């Protein structure tokens, strides 16, 4: 059912299209700026009002707020699932509306709040972040996510099957696998749905 829903989403018409002259995103520092961003999903219900902040390269920023305050909306706008109503989102000075969505999304890694794992091995689930990854790369990502020692304690190690949606792992273990997957991708910008670490 989950995959059917995902594929149905992929088949739908995109809300946002690349600009005719869109170029690939060029990242040198990975500085992120939200410049007076306003957004509404519907014209009569504005979610964001003149949001203005910068995240310097190499720093960590937390966005906190009550349910419905727009935290997830910021992430959706950064991924360009929607375009802003007013203002601009820039990465290294480039308006994300002027770059290809593929290059934008390739530059961003996300650890979602609700972890999705496939009914396959731990190695497969981590390697999904970088198709063709070597075992050494998978293990390095797992070490960085502090899950390697746990994996090695399992009888099958990296070949352990995680079960449907990762049901054979605890919530924290699933999140660490998802973190390793994202770290293996080596994104310039990392977005974490909730503080997992």
Map each language-model feature to its residues.
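Short, small-residue-biased leader/transition segments that mark boundaries at the very start
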Residues: 1-2, 196
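Conserved, function-defining core regions and hallmark residues within catalytic/recognition domains
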Residues: 6
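ABC-type nucleotide-binding domain
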Residues: 11, 16-19, 23-194
């Amino acid at each position: 059912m989950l995959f059917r829903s995902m594929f149905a989403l992929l088949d739908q018409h995109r809300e946002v299209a690349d600009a005719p002259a869109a170029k690939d995103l060029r990242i040198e520092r990975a500085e992120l700026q939200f410049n007076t961003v306003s957004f509404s999903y519907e014209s009569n219900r504005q979610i964001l009002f003149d949001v203005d902040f910068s995240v310097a390269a190499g720093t960590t920023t937390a966005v906190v707020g009550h349910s419905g305050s727009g935290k997830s909306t910021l992430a959706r706008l950064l991924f360009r699932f929607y375009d802003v109503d007013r203002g601009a989102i820039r990465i290294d000075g480039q308006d994300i509306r002027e770059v290809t969505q593929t290059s934008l999304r390739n530059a961003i890694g996300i650890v979602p709040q609700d972890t999705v794992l496939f009914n396959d091995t731990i190695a497969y689930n981590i390697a999904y972040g970088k198709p063709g990854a070597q075992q050494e790369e998978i293990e390095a990502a797992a070490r960085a996510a502090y899950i390697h020692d746990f994996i090695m304690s399992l009888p099958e190690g990296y070949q352990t099957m995680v079960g449907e949606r990762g049901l054979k792992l605890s919530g924290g273990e699933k999140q660490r696998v998802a973190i390793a997957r994202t770290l293996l991708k080596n994104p310039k910008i990392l977005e974490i749905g909730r503080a997992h670490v």
